[in-house]
Curated annotation (Swiss-Prot):
Source organism of the structure: Xanthomonas axonopodis pv. citri (strain 306)
Protein's name in the database: Acetyl-coenzyme A synthetase
EC number: 6.2.1.1
Needed co-factor(s): Mg(2+)
Catalysed conversion reaction: acetate + ATP + CoA = acetyl-CoA + AMP + diphosphate
Amino acid sequence: MADVYPVDPAFAADARVTREQYAALYRESIQHPEQFWGKAAQRLEWFKQPTQIKDVSYALDDFHIRWFGDGELNASVNCLDRQLATRGDKTALLFEPDSPDAASYPVTYRELYERVCKLGNALRNLGVKKGDRVTIYLPMIVDAAVAMLACARIGAVHSVVFGGFAANSIADRVIDCQSKLIITADEGLRGGKKIPLKANVDAALKIPGTNTVETVLVVRHTGGAVEMQAPRDRWFHDVVDGQPAACEPERMNAEDPLFILYTSGSTGKPKGVLHTTAGYLLFASYTHEVVFDLREDDIYWCTADVGWVTGHSYIVYGPLANGATAVMFEGVPNYPNVSRFWEVIDKHQVTIFYTAPTAIRALMRDGADPVKKTSRKSLRLLGSVGEPINPEAWRWYYEVVGDSRCPIVDTWWQTETGGILISPLAGAVDLKPGSATLPFFGVQPALVDAEGKILEGATEGNLVLLDSWPGQMRSVYGDHQRFIDTYFRTYPGSYFTGDGCRRDADGYYWITGRVDDVINVSGHRIGTAEVESALVSHPKVAEAAVVGFPHDVKGQGIYAYVTLIAGQTPSEDLHKELVSWVRKEIGPIASPDHLQWAPGLPKTRSGKIMRRILRKIAENAPDQLGDTSTLADPSVVDSLVNERLAR
């Protein structure tokens, strides 16, 4: 039996949702979804109130997902305009720079509103219209949030690209969504190092197919020298500063696109996950308020980057729609020292802290002292996101960071889901280290076997969701068939998450990790096919296979098996060259942790690579290879086992 940490009665006494309320609200949300979400829609401010709440069919011959379909609203109005009357002087975003020696500063709701309006006007003057796509490739600075909200204000669809991605990854995303304009910065700062953002954009725009980009706006952030190409490149401040501080918001239908965010799939090409305006915004704000038990005076800090969905939902859209104060942190957990997170918590008196298991595991390695030399007395709630948290890391987080007095909300969700789907509510649900516990309102998880049969009781299987929720993605941008095939064809009538899961006797859910060809590295999804195609594009590589393996800090690491073309011999230099080749093609997050030279790969007689075998070798479990008799050349396996890098 897993440890159980009961709800703290003092926390429950003041919580937004109690145990009894959770049970009643969850029941209503499943039995009467139109009634439940119709009431929840009153959280938002509408130009036109919706009368149609839910219109969903997962049937393959009549597939559609629509929420609040006749409603009209604007996301930026909900995040900014409606806060001005009562919260105009309240801090919306609290910027904390990469270096503690640089100045942190608050941005109020009124200041943020004016900055967004100025940029919205500038974008309109540059010819950006409703429905046009704008690529945002910025560091974790306030202008990243400004850019997202300015797009939302004028009805443009933003596509944020994580600042750690390289030129090819930027180009892929620009080409896929036919972006009209890019907003970037001269350079980013991360852990004291400069990231050449503008130079990466320049390199991306030399790649064929990117010529839809008419303008590049460049934020002067570090002041580093960059090449400016007239008339395409313009300094952000030159274009924005003189604009009026009011901007007429576009009236958006509830189902109009709000943003595209690319995520790795099990095939090589990243998927453009499309989220729409009303359902996404409602779900992000509702989950943010309830899961984090939000109060008016909270200082909330989510350490994610806006380049990922966690930054979209739980730094920008959720907190601002709720009138909260959110910390925006440019830095990393271990620069200039490993106390940085805890020093920032004390400096800004952070009350709610939301981070990834990878960061926790990395900081655990340095022991309790760097944590204990800070106070952290302001904290009242901790959260975890991005990957399953192992019980050891959960306990360390609870006991060392939270001094055994702050509940932990271990949240499970995905880019595709828009917001949190399974998580404890700290005033309502007892905690178990390593379990995401119970579903949020309107979320119906089920476990199925390989044939799609629903499994009851305490069991393990593939995690599916039986019905829709407002924050659900609506399509893969430009490829609706891929959306249906990826998520709804495997188990017809339900959404397939791609995750394995176990349910215990108390009905708690324990996510066990991906069951497809996607690796979760530090909470970031990397498609094995993406890394394989990057490796194979090197002139000396004949073939490559990539799998995940358990990693103490990152959760999963990347293990690559590489076969060279005839006449090439493995060397340390070539090893280094291939690792940096992947960094250049995709970005540092995709760098292989292990790269093993392979004389051949284990294949069936039909030529299919047996990844199951490669995974077991990478996991250092050569005794669990199973049946290898169907392989075209079983001797390949012996050689790979003998040369394995995982010991």
